C-alpha cells in the first residue's frame, strides 16, 4: 500500500484536561506518514504549553495560536485551511477524544483501494457504547446518494455519517472552498457530508477506530438548551435534499420535519417556561428558512400532540424517552471569553429563499 500524507488537525479551546491523551493517540499510530496541526483558540488553561511541549519533541507537530478568539466552527475551518498542500487525506480529532492505533492506517487503506470515496467513517466508542452500527457488513463503499437518502428519509438512529473525530476526509474536498464546514451551526460537520457526497462515495471501516468523550463539559449546552439542531437539520433538508430526494419525497420530509419542529415549540410554549431568547431564536430561524412562525401552526401542532398522547400514551412516552436518551451533540463546547459571544446560526453560505408552495 502507498503511504500518502495524512494531515491531522485538532482545533482546541481550554482543552488541557485531555489534550495530552489526544496527542499521544496520534503519536501511537501504526501509520507514520502524517503531520499534525493544533490550533489553539486563545486558551487560558495551559493548553498552549502542553501543545508546544509535544511540538518540541516531534517535528511533525506544529502549534498555531489564534490572535483573536473565533467561534467554534470558524476555528475548525481555520484548522482545515492549515492542512499541508501535500496531504492526500485529512483527519480531525477533537481535543478531548482520541484515536485507536490503527485508525489512520485502516482508513487510508480503504481510501487508497477506492478512489471514488471522499469521506470515510468507522465504528466509534462513545463513552461505554459503540456508535454508528447501521452499515451492513461486509459492504465498505456506499454511493453518496444512497447514504444521504437513507438519512434524509429517516434512517434508524444507529445510522449516520459519524462525528468529526470518527471521520476522515479526502484532502481535495477540504481544499474546495474557504470553509469546509459550510455554515456556523452545531450540525456543520453533517452539512459538509451532505454537500460533498453529492459527487463522491462514502466508505466505512468495520472497526472501532476512535473514542468520543461525552460529558457535561463537552456538550454545547447553549445549543442543547435552544435546540438548534432541529433548525440545522431543516436547513440541510432544504439546501441539500433536492440533490438526493425526488419532489414528492422532499415535500413529505419537509412537511414531517416542520410539523415536528412545531410540536417541539408547542410543548415548550405550554409547559417549557422558555425565556425570550428561546422564542426570538426560533422565530428568526423559521423566518430565515422560509417557514414563518405563526400561532395557527402552533395551535395545530398542540392539538396533534395532545391527541397522539391521549390515543397512544405508551407511544408518546416512548418517543419522548428515546429523544431524551439518544440526542447527539455535534461539537465540543467552546465557552466564550468574557464579553464575547459565539456567533449564531446566521446563514453565511447562501440566503435561502422560501420553498415553493407545493413543498410546504
Q: Where do the language-model regions lie?
A:
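Short loop->beta transition adjacent to catalytic acidic/histidine clusters or analogous donor-positioning motifs
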Residues: 3-6, 27-38, 46, 59-62
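A conserved acidic beta->alpha catalytic loop
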Residues: 25, 32, 40-49, 68, ...
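Short beta-strand-to-loop acidic/aromatic patch adjacent to the donor-nucleotide binding site
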Residues: 86-96
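Conserved nucleotide-sugar donor-binding catalytic segment
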Residues: 141-233
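Short, well-formed alpha-helical segments that are part of the catalytic scaffolds
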Residues: 14-28, 34
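Conserved donor NDP-sugar-binding/catalytic core segment of glycosyltransferases
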Residues: 102-135
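Glycine-rich, basic loop-to-helix element that forms the pyrophosphate-binding segment
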Residues: 66-85
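Membrane-interface aromatic/basic loop that binds lipid-linked glycans or pyrophosphate carriers
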Residues: 268-360
Amino acid at each position: 500500500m502507498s503511504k500518502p500524507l495524512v494531515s491531522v488537525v485538532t482545533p482546541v479551546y481550554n482543552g488541557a484536561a485531555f489534550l495530552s491523551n489526544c496527542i499521544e493517540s496520534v503519536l501511537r499510530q501504526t501509520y507514520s506518514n502524517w503531520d499534525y496541526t493544533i490550533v489553539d483558540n486563545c486558551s487560558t488553561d495551559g493548553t498552549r504549553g502542553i501543545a508546544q511541549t509535544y511540538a518540541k519533541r516531534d517535528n511533525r507537530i506544529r502549534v498555531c495560536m489564534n490572535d483573536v478568539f473565533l467561534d467554534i466552527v470558524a476555528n475548525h475551518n481555520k484548522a482545515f485551511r492549515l492542512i499541508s498542500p501535500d496531504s492526500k487525506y485529512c483527519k480531525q480529532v477533537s481535543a478531548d477524544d482520541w484515536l485507536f492505533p490503527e485508525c489512520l492506517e485502516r482508513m487510508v487503506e480503504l481510501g487508497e483501494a477506492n478512489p471514488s470515496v471522499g469521506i470515510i467513517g468507522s465504528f466509534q466508542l462513545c463513552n461505554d457504547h459503540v456508535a454508528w452500527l447501521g452499515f451492513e457488513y461486509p459492504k465498505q463503499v456506499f454511493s453518496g446518494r444512497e447514504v444521504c437518502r437513507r438519512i434524509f428519509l429517516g434512517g434508524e438512529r444507529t445510522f449516520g455519517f459519524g462525528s468529526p473525530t470518527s471521520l476522515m476526509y479526502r484532502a481535495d474536498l477540504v481544499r474546495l472552498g474557504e470553509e469546509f464546514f459550510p455554515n456556523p451551526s452545531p450540525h456543520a460537520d453533517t452539512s459538509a457530508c451532505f454537500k460533498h457526497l453529492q459527487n463522491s462515495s462514502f466508505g466505512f471501516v468495520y472497526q472501532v477506530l476512535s473514542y468520543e468523550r461525552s460529558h457535561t463539559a463537552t456538550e454545547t449546552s447553549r445549543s442543547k438548551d435552544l435546540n438548534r439542531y432541529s433548525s440545522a437539520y431543516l436547513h440541510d433538508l432544504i439546501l441539500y435534499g433536492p440533490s438526493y430526494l425526488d419532489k414528492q419525497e422532499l415535500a413529505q420530509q419537509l412537511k414531517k420535519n416542520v410539523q415536528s419542529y412545531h410540536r417541539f415549540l408547542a410543548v415548550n410554549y405550554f409547559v417549557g417556561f422558555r425565556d425570550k431568547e428561546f422564542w426570538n431564536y426560533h422565530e428568526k430561524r423559521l423566518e430565515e428558512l422560509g417557514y414563518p412562525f405563526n400561532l395557527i401552526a402552533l395551535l395545530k401542532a398542540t392539538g396533534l400532540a395532545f391527541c397522539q398522547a391521549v390515543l397512544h400514551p405508551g407511544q408518546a412516552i416512548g418517543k419522548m424517552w428515546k429523544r431524551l436518551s439518544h440526542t447527539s451533540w455535534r461539537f465540543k463546547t467552546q465557552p466564550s471569553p468574557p464579553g464575547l459571544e459565539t456567533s449564531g446560526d446566521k446563514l453565511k453560505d447562501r440566503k435561502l429563499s422560501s420553498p415553493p408552495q407545493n413543498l410546504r
